[in-house]
Amino acid sequence: LATGVADVDISNQTNPGEKDLFTLKPKLLQILRTLQEVEKTRTTFTYHDVTYYLLTYLLDNENRLYENRNLDVACIGLDPLGEVFRVDYFHKIQIFRLIKAQLIPFPKIRLR
């Protein structure tokens, strides 16, 4: 794992379309499936779903992942999320780029 805050370029944070579907890299999928709200057999998600569930995970674990002195930085080095994102810490503005790296576009099926 890298030390320090994630070194992520946030200059281009355009979000995927509302209806675009993605599968997730296995480790993030495993973490999200620990949430009660996520069906254990679910395999596709929208970008909105992923951000919602990840923020739910972070809030559910805020006592472990955030220090009172700086609530803008998540300390995930000792959490499975640290292995997923390959960082020990990240600033809240970096979350979108970190999530995008975990998304695998689900092929669109075109009907003739």
Where are these regions (language model features)?
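Histone-fold and other basic nucleic-acid-binding segments
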Residues: 1-112
